[in-house]
Amino acid sequence: SLIHADLTRDHLLGQLSPHGNWRLRAIIDFGDAISGDLFYELVVLHLEIFDADLHMLREFLTAYQPSPFHLQGFVRKAMNLTLLHAYDPFNTLFARHPALRQCTSLNELASRLWDVSRSQ
């Protein structure tokens, strides 16, 4: 799949509705676009734009309706893509969420970042 690969706040253009709801209107700057896993986009989307909020991620996944194939082993896949991502999210993430530095394993960090069942 062709993916944007740099879905940061400055590449998403939106507009507030009269009711105060933000709506995406455009995605810009496809200079980093690559062929890759669709969930590669989730790394920056979740860790930067959603600020690692598991409830927001769960709502996004519910609306997006990924295939069972993509959801199988989701936490592990998402953490692998986080570790491989060209944009290193960890410095910013640990600065905003210092408690994450207390994780004693990658499995624990993966669970705290990506296990949407924790948000219920």
Please place each PLM-identified region on the residue numbering.
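The feature marks helicase ATPase cores and/or their adjacent C-terminal helical subdomains
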Residues: 1, 100-101, 106
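Regulatory N- and C-terminal appendages and interdomain linkers associated
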Residues: 114-120
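Alpha-helical scaffolds flanking conserved acidic
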Residues: 74-81
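Glycine-rich, phosphate-binding/catalytic loops in enzymes
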Residues: 19-21, 43-45, 62, 107-108
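Catalytic core of nucleotide-sugar-dependent glycosyltransferases
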Residues: 57-58, 110-112
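Active-site activation/catalytic loop segments of kinase-like enzymes and analogous catalytic loops
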Residues: 39-70, 82-99
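Active-site acidic catalytic loop and adjacent metal/ATP-binding pocket
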Residues: 1-42
